[in-house]
Amino acid sequence: MTNIRKTHPLLKIVNNAFIDLPAPSNISSWWNFGSLLGICLVLQILTGLFLAMHYTADTTTAFSSVTHICRDVNYGWIIRYMHANGASMFFICLFMHVGRGLYYGSYTYMETWNIGVILLFATMATAFMGYVLPWGQMSFWGATVITNLLSAIPYIGTNLVEWIWGGFSVDKATLTRFFAFHFIFPFIIAALAMVHLLFLHETGSNNPTGISSDADKIPFHPYYTIKDILGALLLILVLMTLVLFSPDLLGDPDNYTPANPLNTPPHIKPEWYFLFAYAILRSIPNKLGGVLALVLSILVLVLMPLLHTSKQRSMMFRPISQCLFWILVADLLTLTWIGGQPVEHPYIIIGQLASIMYFLLILVLMPMASTIENNLLKW
């Protein structure tokens, strides 16, 4: 008799996705981040659910309710800090996952890649709305500054911003709707992630060489299940080290001051994982131009399959492209640093140069390098 896992309508899906799935025999630890992102999402949904049980989405009590969670709720402090730092781990895994995709040419799986870009946008939107909920100074002013960017849209901008605010400023209506959206979005992300996986399993995983691995497949279980468990343990180790030893390391001290519309903090800045985009936004003196650059900095990922001029899929055997890739990584780190600095000399010019470099590398230099490498292969 056939094993139940191969015949049962539900178990069959799990079996084909996580047990008997044919996987390339040579995928490295860079392929661990997909499962780690899944773990991060489940962790965020669970901790978020328990936080929502004690949180109140009202301007008068939101800040106090978060304090109450940390002081009076059983293990509330650890749930709160796991949720806050879990977001950081989520974005570290996201950036690594996208970086892996860029390096090894995984973007040639167009459907999987484009859903991934939508997932990235959805996760960024969720994290932004979540940051508003504690209703500290940085929550309030971050919400004000970022939502205000939509007013740069010609003709409908102002109406759009007031519609999102639910009034003429960030207030109770804004907080309530942000809480509602912050609660529902992770479930939308989970659904999209399943579609992401569905499309991936249509083609099978890419591998470091970028060459078809159909001739050499191994079952996902036990090989990659055990590998994913190791990755998960390392993720939890890093997360819990952060939570238990320095939970506020990545946060902003300003968010421990209750929101005050009459007092603007000296330096308004988002969480660290948005700083690179924030630096690109600030490097353009024009409001609409800045907003466009901000959106394009992520949307440029959609163009990656079109910008792929190389005859090889992966960068494994392309040293020039490798150099440019790591320069891009360094550039993104520079932008992240600049995003957290005040708007003054020399930071302004460094930010502008790094922003130009970012788009230049992706849109011009990397496709050029690929063409040069193609020609070098003819010799």
Swiss-Prot record:
Its primary localisation, in coarse terms, equals mitochondrion
Membrane-related topology note? Multi-pass membrane protein
Q: What does the Swiss-Prot or TrEMBL cofactor note state?
A: Binds 2 heme b groups non-covalently.
The record's section on Gene3D superfamilies has: Cytochrome Bc1 Complex, Chain C
Question: Which Gene Ontology MF annotations are present?
Answer: metal ion binding; ubiquinol-cytochrome-c reductase activity
| Subcellular location field | Mitochondrion inner membrane
Disulfide bond entries: none
Provide the transmembrane region boundaries: 33-53, 77-98, 113-133, 178-198, 226-246, 288-308, 320-340, 347-367
Which residues are involved in binding heme b b566?
A: 97, 196
UniProt keywords, alphabetically: Electron transport, Heme, Iron, Membrane, Metal-binding, Mitochondrion, Mitochondrion inner membrane, Respiratory chain, Transmembrane, Transmembrane helix, Transport, Ubiquinone
User: Where is the signal peptide, in residue numbers?
Assistant: none
The record's listing under Pfam families reads: Cytochrom_B_C, Cytochrome_B
The record's annotation in InterPro entries points to: Cyt_b/b6_C, Cyt_b/b6_C_sf, Cyt_b/b6_N, Cytb/b6-like_sf, Cytochrome_b, Cytochrome_b_C_euk/bac, Cytochrome_b_N_euk/bac, Di-haem_cyt_TM
Q: Which residues bind a ubiquinone?
A: 201
Q: Which cofactors, by name?
A: heme b
Query: An example Gene Ontology cellular component term from the record?
Result: mitochondrial inner membrane
List of residues binding heme b b562: 83, 182
Q: Name one GO biological process term.
A: mitochondrial electron transport, ubiquinol to cytochrome c
The text of the family note is: Belongs to the cytochrome b family.
- Other notes: Heme 1 (or BL or b562) is low-potential and absorbs at about 562 nm, and heme 2 (or BH or b566) is high-potential and absorbs at about 566 nm.
Q: What does this protein do?
A: Component of the ubiquinol-cytochrome c reductase complex (complex III or cytochrome b-c1 complex) that is part of the mitochondrial respiratory chain. The b-c1 complex mediates electron transfer from ubiquinol to cytochrome c. Contributes to the generation of a proton gradient across the mitochondrial membrane that is then used for ATP synthesis.
Quaternary state and interactors: The cytochrome bc1 complex contains 11 subunits: 3 respiratory subunits (MT-CYB, CYC1 and UQCRFS1), 2 core proteins (UQCRC1 and UQCRC2) and 6 low-molecular weight proteins (UQCRH/QCR6, UQCRB/QCR7, UQCRQ/QCR8, UQCR10/QCR9, UQCR11/QCR10 and a cleavage product of UQCRFS1). This cytochrome bc1 complex then forms a dimer.
Its recorded name reads Cytochrome b
What organism, scientifically named, is this protein from? Cephalophorus rubidus (Ruwenzori duiker)
